[in-house]
C-alpha cells in the first residue's frame, strides 16, 4: 500500500531566459570601435554618424569618440551617434 497520495502534474514551470537588452553605454561616455551601445529588438534607436547596426538591430561604435543621443526628424526618431572627443 502506498503511504502517500500520488502528486498531480502541472503544465506550468517554464520561463525564458532574460535577453539582457537595453542601453549599454550612455551619452557622454568615451567609446572605441566595436563597443556595443544598445541591444534592442527592432529599431527603438537608429544608427547615426559613426554607429553601425547588426543583423539583430544591435548598435555598435564604428569610430572612437564620445556617444551622443539625439531626437530628430519628422517622426522624432532617437538617433545614437559617435562624435570626436
Swiss-Prot record:
GO biological process: translation
Name of the encoding gene: rpmA
Spans through the membrane: none
Record has tRNA processing as a keyword: no
Pfam family, one: Ribosomal_L27
A GO term from the CC aspect: cytosolic large ribosomal subunit
Disulfide-bond pairs as recorded: none
GO molecular function: structural constituent of ribosome
Top-rank taxon: Bacteria
Protein name: Large ribosomal subunit protein bL27
InterPro entries hit by this protein: Ribosomal_bL27, Ribosomal_bL27_CS
Protein family (similarity comment): Belongs to the bacterial ribosomal protein bL27 family.
Keyword Phosphoprotein on entry: no
